[in-house]
């Protein structure tokens, strides 16, 4: 089949010949790559989108239980979930491609819910009926006049306490298996995390509602990303809110495990990427964005997805979900010594690329090595299936993960550049105001009062901006007296 796909009729060429390079589909594990290529041949809209979703599905299928660690550094344990946003214009096939690639996870959830309804819920219902009947019997006994009650009221109270505890436990166990969430308030999200032991997948082929919620639809317009940040890091979560009846509800989740892949059109991705709270809170820096090259499809070139490729892919993802997502407790993927060193070297290179911290790109690059580590875990599971935990992650897999990370950084750096441009626009506006107010030049102290470095930055940050503007030829120092600045004559 792989040979057949290599000899498909050529697809229509991209209109933009300077477009970013294609997704490095060659680094994907064989069964995953085969399905991504088959979906691309079926849709004829390009391989980027199907390949990007395929990589995400790998991490989603293991994130519930898998953590990554080097034996020599037990203090550094990394979750295996990844956050991803794929962007494509209307008509690029997002819904169909996403539906085909994510189908095994949705099917796994559906089958688990059907088994629960058939094999588990009836027994829980029967147990609840028995408990409620005994509660009613003891409640009726307690309601009798004192002279008609049994002798041992304390024993009855203790028994009622035990029964009510059992009833609460049964009701908690009656929540059907749920792995996927889409449109949700923070409150319902927190309740789901409580019911699932902190594990959840955020998957959607049309994430407008998810982004609306993230940007504050239920939070007075303020972006609400706290639960996602906790889930990405695997941290515990505590949610407290007063309900409409005045009762305070507290939900405690000891730890979280989360992965996300949402698909949107460019306008929603732009709205998300330009939101200041998400930039400053760090969510954007944790996301892999893929602006896909997908183009109009050609029905005459479409090839059906071979059933054996579809079935192999489905069963493989089922295998990963059973073994790793639904694992009891943690399953550790260990990094080999060479893999650990490769990630440390990559981290150092990323820190060098971040420069002196004057450009927002550094807030993205500090995450490069960690995200590559997570990607390597997904690739490792894709290579070895349910035996992945029996072997260390080899350095070759780290190199493949770094190839993916370098691809993701193309779009991540576009976001960082946009953040820098917007920040510089604000600085320049304030400098122009200072130049108008102080035509003979303004001092660093006056620039600090104008807060050219932002609300919470001090004299050192202000001076760094002024020095950079002088270096770039935007400002010049006034010749005489204490330091004062004017716009440079050009």
Residue ranges, per PLM feature:
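Phosphate-handling catalytic cores of nucleic-acid transaction enzymes
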Residues: 1-490
């Amino acid at each position: 089949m792989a040979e057949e796909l290599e000899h498909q009729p050529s697809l229509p060429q991209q209109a933009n010949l300077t477009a970013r390079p294609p997704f490095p589909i060659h680094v994907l594990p064989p069964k995953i790559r085969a399905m991504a290529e088959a979906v691309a041949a079926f849709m004829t809209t390009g391989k980027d989108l199907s390949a990007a979703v395929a990589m995400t599905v790998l991490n989603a299928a293991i994130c519930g239980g898998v953590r990554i660690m080097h034996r020599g550094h037990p203090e550094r344990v990394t979750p295996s979930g990844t956050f991803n946003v794929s962007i494509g214009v209307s008509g690029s096939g997002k819904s169909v491609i996403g539906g085909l690639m994510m189908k095994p996870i949705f099917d796994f959830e559906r089958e688990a819910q059907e088994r629960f309804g058939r094999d588990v819920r009836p027994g829980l219902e029967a147990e609840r009926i028995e408990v409620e009947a005994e509660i009613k019997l003891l409640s009726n006994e307690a309601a009798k006049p004192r002279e008609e009650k049994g002798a041992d009221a304390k024993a009855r109270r203790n028994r009622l306490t035990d029964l009510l505890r059992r009833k609460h436990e049964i009701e908690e166990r009656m929540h059907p298996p749920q792995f996927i969430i889409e449109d949700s308030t923070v409150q319902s999200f927190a309740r789901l995390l409580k019911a699932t032991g902190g594990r959840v997948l955020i998957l959607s082929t049309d994430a407008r509602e998810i982004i609306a919620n993230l940007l504050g639809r239920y939070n007075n317009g303020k972006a609400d990303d706290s639960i996602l940040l906790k889930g990405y890091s695997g941290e515990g979560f505590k949610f407290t809110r007063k309900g409409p009846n005045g009762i305070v509800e507290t939900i405690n989740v000891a730890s979280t495990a989360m992965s996300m892949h949402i698909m949107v059109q460019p306008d929603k991705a732009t709205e998300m990427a330009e939101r200041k709270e998400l930039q400053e809170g760090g969510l954007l820096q944790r996301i892999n964005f893929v602006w896909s090259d997908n183009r109009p499809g050609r029905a005459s070139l479409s090839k059906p997805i071979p059933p054996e490729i579809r079935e192999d892919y489905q069963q493989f993802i089922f295998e990963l979900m059973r073994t790793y997502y639904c694992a009891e407790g943690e399953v550790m993927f260990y990094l080999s010594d060479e893999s650990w060193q490769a990630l440390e070297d990559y981290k150092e290179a990323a820190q060098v690329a971040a420069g002196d911290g004057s450009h927002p790109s550094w807030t993205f690059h500090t995450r490069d090595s960690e995200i590559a580590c997570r990607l390597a875990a997904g690739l490792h599971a894709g290579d070895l299936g349910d035996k992945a935990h029996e072997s260390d992650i080899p350095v070759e897999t780290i190199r493949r993960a770094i190839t993916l990370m370098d691809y993701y950084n193309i779009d991540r750096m576009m976001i960082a550049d946009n953040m820098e441009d917007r920040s510089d626009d604000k600085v320049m506006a304030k400098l122009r105001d200072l130049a108008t107010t102080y035509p003979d030049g303004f001092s660093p102290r006056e620039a600090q009062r104008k807060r050219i470095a932002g609300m919470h930055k001090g004299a050192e940050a202000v001076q760094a901006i002024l020095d950079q503007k002088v270096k770039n030829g935007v400002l010049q120092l006034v010749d005489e007296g204490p330091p004062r600045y004017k716009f440079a004559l050009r």
